[in-house]
């Protein structure tokens, strides 16, 4: 079954994005927002990748389930994803946890976040449901996963990829046979089983699932009636289907979208401060691992109206310049020097400041004569004159959130405490 021969299966699919998680390993970066709403890549939010994959794959019915501190996420979705047309059989629904099933029941798990909205799914009558995690960064054609699901007659198809075995404790780990039928599935095991012939690698779930809608609804009703269930796909639904049905693995390499500039399949959890910093800073390389300039697979997002970036002053020691950096619209670099730095919308960096290896979120303001190295600066933070970060590890650890690898997360409450 291939595109151009038959109608794309994506036309008959609905994408359901789970976007309610906090992402606590990002520490204070998610104090005010859910992980899917965290900024990424200069102008996007993390959730834009899953949504753009769905749109670029041809899926035109999308729902997003939200829960933890959802205001900024909902505002972003309303502003940036409001172009769907019902008269063209398109839809975009935002589904906050709202006690729709019981007066004392929020979303109890990932499966429950779908179960509580079964009536909305049924109202659109899709043949397939593509369940997505809204907190990963990657480019993927879900049409190819749908094709494998149909061709193999699966009850559920699970997106998977190889990771280092040492990292697999954070994921669902599976073992498959020669036809990619899943034989076992363990959610976040303390001792992940290795892949055959690859003792240091494990095959893990990406948190992406394809179901026939009818089968999924039956499974959700069965799970909801089980008082011993945690109502979670990875812990309950998928292991049950592995034992009692047919669960098939879909390898990410088969559907990863790569431009001519991308040599390997790119997928990032970006779930820790270190991983988040590294994934963003990688974009400043000459040839980054993730190509955001791929016009054939754009990452859609809310396009805030801003003037172009501006660089001013041209004297020794006070020259507005940026080398190997990404500078978004509305930024003003006033006599400051940037190296391997990513600035989101509306950032201002004032004279005599030196910034290197920095991820600076929207509308932060870096005052004069600062030296910042290997930092993540939260949105709207006001960095005071002369602040130095990245040169004294002990001082940094007392004042900011410093990781073991030396990355400092800076938020406004941390800055406010400097004067106390």
From Swiss-Prot:
InterPro entries, per database record: ADP-Glc_PPase, ADP_Glu_pyroP_CS, GlgC_bac, GlmU/GlgC-like_hexapep, NTP_transferase_dom, Nucleotide-diphossugar_trans, Trimer_LpxA-like_sf
Role noted for this protein: Involved in the biosynthesis of ADP-glucose, a building block required for the elongation reactions to produce glycogen. Catalyzes the reaction between ATP and alpha-D-glucose 1-phosphate (G1P) to produce pyrophosphate and ADP-Glc.
Membership in a protein family: Belongs to the bacterial/plant glucose-1-phosphate adenylyltransferase family.
Pathway: Glycan biosynthesis; glycogen biosynthesis
The entry's keywords: ATP-binding, Carbohydrate metabolism, Glycogen biosynthesis, Glycogen metabolism, Nucleotide-binding, Nucleotidyltransferase, Transferase
EC identifiers of the protein: 2.7.7.27
Keyword Transmembrane helix part of the UniProt annotation: no
Gene: glgC
Name by which UniProt lists this protein: Glucose-1-phosphate adenylyltransferase
């Amino acid at each position: 079954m291939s595109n151009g021969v038959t109608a794309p299966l994506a036309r008959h699919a609905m994408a359901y994005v789970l976007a309610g998680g906090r992402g606590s390993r990002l520490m204070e970066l998610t104090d005010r927002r859910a992980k899917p709403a965290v900024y990424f890549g200069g102008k996007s939010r993390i959730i834009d990748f899953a949504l753009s994959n769905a749109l670029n794959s041809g899926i035109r019915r999308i729902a997003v389930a939200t829960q933890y501190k959802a205001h900024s996420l909902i505002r972003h979705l309303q502003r940036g994803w409001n172009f769907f047309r019902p008269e063209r059989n398109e839809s975009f629904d935002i589904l906050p946890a709202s006690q729709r099933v019981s007066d004392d029941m929020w979303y109890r798990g990932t499966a429950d976040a779908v179960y509580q909205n079964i009536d909305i799914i049924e109202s659109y009558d899709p043949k397939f449901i593509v369940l997505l995690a809204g907190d990963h960064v990657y480019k993927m054609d879900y049409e190819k996963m749908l094709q494998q699901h149909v061709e193999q007659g699966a009850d559920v198809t699970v997106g998977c990829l190889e990771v280092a075995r040492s990292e697999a404790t954070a994921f669902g780990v599976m073992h498959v046979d020669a036809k990619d039928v899943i034989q076992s599935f363990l959610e976040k095991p303390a001792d992940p089983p290795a892949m055959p012939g690859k003792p240091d690698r494990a095959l893990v779930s990406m948190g992406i699932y394809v179901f026939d809608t009818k089968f999924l609804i039956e499974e959700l009703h069965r799970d909801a009636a089980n008082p011993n269930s945690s109502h979670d796909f990875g812990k309950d639904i998928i292991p049950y289907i592995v034992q009692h049905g047919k669960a098939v693995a879909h390898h990410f390499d088969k559907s990863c979208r790569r431009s001519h500039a991308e040599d390997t399949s790119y997928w990032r959890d970006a779930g820790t401060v270190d991983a988040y910093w590294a994934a963003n800073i990688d974009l400043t390389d000459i040839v980054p691992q993730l190509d955001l300039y791929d016009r054939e697979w754009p990452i859609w997002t809310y396009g805030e109206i801003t003037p172009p970036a501006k660089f001013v002053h041209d004297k020794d020691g006070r020259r507005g310049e940026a080398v190997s950096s990404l500078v978004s619209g509305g930024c003003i670099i006033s006599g400051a020097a940037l190296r391997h730095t990513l600035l989101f919308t509306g950032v201002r960096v004032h004279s005599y400041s030196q910034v290197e290896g920095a991820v600076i979120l929207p509308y932060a303001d870096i005052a004069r004569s600062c030296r910042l190295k290997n930092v993540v600066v939260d949105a709207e933070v006001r960095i005071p004159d002369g602040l130095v970060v990245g040169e004294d590890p002990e001082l940094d650890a007392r004042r900011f959130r410093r990781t073991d690898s030396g990355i400092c997360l800076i938020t406004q409450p941390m800055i406010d405490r400097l004067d106390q």
